[in-house]
Amino acid sequence: MLAFAGVRLGGAARAVCLVLAGLTLAGCGINTIPTLDEQAKAAWSEVLNQFQRRADLIPNLVETVKGFAEQESKVLTEVVEARAKATQVQIPPDILTNKEAFGKFQDAQNNLSGALGRLLVVVERYPDLKSNQNFLALQSQLEGTENRIAIARRDYIVAVKDYNTELRTIPGRWWRALLYPEAEPMENFSVSEETTQNPKVEF
């Protein structure tokens, strides 16, 4: 039997005490760190999904542009090479707490965004390309994907900010020391970068 203040408690009373203790701990934020950790990881997965979606659109986009503007080989090559680097960058399991790996991923995606932006500027010189039905369909898909990338990045920024704040403040800092010593602050995109890097899809 469980003894409380000198009084022995039976099975039912003991169960009630354990439930109340659990609710008290939950109310004090014992589960907040793992909950925010999962939310940040889910947001990161969506970021990866949307960047991959963009990468999947690029080969068809390049081929379509090439059909109307083959002389723009320099810009087309830049896009192809930037895509290759972005899709080949290593994503280790600890990327969210690995500053170097996160930085390399970020740089690769930013380079691809820059190359795409330069390609879209070139497109302005070719009215026939801008009216091509296949290109219009790709334009719509790319525009939607860029919007989803922006949303996914913003969601990740917020999720990581909440998680990192919990690790630094009380009571999260206490729970981290007691129960989650392996929890580390996560890397994040900067808000200013998020607003400047995504290419604008306007034709």
PLM region descriptions:
Residues 2-4, 9, 16-203:
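A helix-centric hydrophobic-segment signal that preferentially recognizes long
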